[in-house]
Curated annotation (Swiss-Prot):
Family stated for the protein in its record: Belongs to the methyltransferase superfamily.
Matching Pfam families: Methyltransf_25
Top-level division of the source organism's lineage: Eukaryota
Protein name, UniProt field: N-methyltransferase FrzE
Keyword Iron: no
Enzyme class: transferase
Keywords (A to Z) from UniProt: Methyltransferase, Transferase
Pathway the protein acts in: Secondary metabolite biosynthesis
Catalytic activity: (1S,4S)-4-[(4-hydroxyphenyl)methyl]-2,5-diazaspiro[bicyclo[3.2.1]octane-6,1'-cyclohexan]-4'-one + S-adenosyl-L-methionine = (1S,4S)-4-[(4-hydroxyphenyl)methyl]-2-methyl-2,5-diazaspiro[bicyclo[3.2.1]octane-6,1'-cyclohexan]-4'-one + S-adenosyl-L-homocysteine + H(+); (1S,4S)-4-[(4-methoxyphenyl)methyl]-2,5-diazaspiro[bicyclo[3.2.1]octane-6,1'-cyclohexan]-4'-one + S-adenosyl-L-methionine = (1S,4S)-4-[(4-methoxyphenyl)methyl]-2-methyl-2,5-diazaspiro[bicyclo[3.2.1]octane-6,1'-cyclohexan]-4'-one + S-adenosyl-L-homocysteine + H(+)
Role, per record: N-methyltransferase; part of the gene cluster that mediates the biosynthesis of the alkaloid (-)-FR901483, a potent immunosuppressant that shows efficacy in animal models and a probable inhibitor of purine nucleotide biosynthesis by targeting phosphoribosylpyrophosphate amidotransferase (PPAT). Within the pathway, FrzE methylates the amine at position C10'. The biosynthesis of (-)-FR901483 starts with the condensation of two L-tyrosines to yield (S,S)-dityrosyl-piperazine.
Organism: Cladobotryum sp
Record bears the keyword Methyltransferase: yes
């Protein structure tokens, strides 16, 4: 029986959200949590030293909550940090990803965490749902999420929206895919997400995910990565059956430091630091005024 193929925007099914969770949550190649934790703790301690010690963290494109859950785990186990005044908000455009985020871990009772469907270009909608009178002390847009903003004007809209939800002096931490930053000519780039991946589901017994690249192209400021992802059911005797095949054509924006600086400055955000880790550059931007 032929496998039915479906066009996918990558995380638009429960299986694909589970694949993401199974692949990336504890992936050894990801080194970003240490960077986010350092900025997060510094900002929280600064906030706790003030009369109004309320702290609001907004995680944009939270996915299955990898970054948010990791920071909460560290905060719970840090004697210097008080969770009483903290509020954690995770936002993603995929309800399937948020479903995974909400059930990924049992949060301690004292942790206030909320999850919302939304977009990176209308963050003020999410912030108002979470706290009508509050603004964010810290905003995180992790795992090269900004590269996925590929429609005309979307990156400018993101920065403007980020500034609206940040407190004056608040901080945004924005991850950019290093292989897609400051590209000088050429018609190909290294696949930013690696080659063939095969991973067992952490939650669904007998389910295996297998993904491979089928092509790539560069047109103007866009790099399109084409992939196929199979959802495979593995029987006890080891035989396999593909139960879902997903076809992805993922447009990613090629970015430059100068372009990011201009877009940020137009939104009254100032790049104050950048941290280079494996396959990522994390920019720290401060809300001016």
């Amino acid at each position: 029986m032929a496998v039915v193929e479906r066009d996918s925007d990558y995380y638009d099914s429960s299986y694909l959200a589970d694949y993401y969770e199974s692949l990336w949550t504890d992936h050894a190649a990801l080194e970003d949590i240490a960077v986010y934790w350092a900025f997060f703790k510094e900002r929280v301690l600064l906030s706790q030293s003030r009369v109004d010690s309320k702290f609001f963290l907004l995680d944009v494109g939270t996915g299955t909550g990898r970054v948010l859950h990791s920071l909460i785990d560290k905060a719970v186990n840090d004697a210097d940090m008080s969770l009483d005044a903290m509020q954690f908000v995770g936002m993603d455009k995929s309800p399937f990803m948020l479903e995974q985020a909400q059930r990924a871990k049992q949060l301690p009772q004292e942790v206030r965490a909320s999850w919302f469907v939304g977009t990176a270009t209308a963050l003020e909608d999410i912030a108002s749902l979470a706290d009508p009178h509050g603004k964010a002390n810290l905003l995180i847009f992790a795992f090269s999420g900004i590269n996925h903003l590929h429609q005309p004007g979307e990156i400018d809209q993101f920065f403007l929206s980020a500034r609206r939800v940040l407190l004056p002096g608040g901080l945004a931490l924005v991850s950019v895919c290093a292989p897609l930053l400051d590209i000088e000519g050429g018609d190909s780039v290294p696949n930013p997400y690696g080659q063939v991946k095969e991973v067992k589901s952490k939650r669904l017994e007998g389910i295996l995910y297998r993904e491979w690249e089928t092509g790539q192209k560069i047109e103007g400021h866009l790099f399109t990565n084409s992939l196929k992802t199979d959802v495979v059911q593995v029987s006890q005797d080891g035989s396999e059956r593909v139960i879902e095949r997903n076809i992805h054509n993922i447009p990613l924006t090629l970015l430059t430091r100068d372009g990011l600086r201009r877009s940020a400055a137009a939104a009254k955000l100032e790049i104050i630091e950048e941290r280079c880790i494996r396959d990522e550059v994390i920019f720290a931007l401060r809300a001016v005024g």
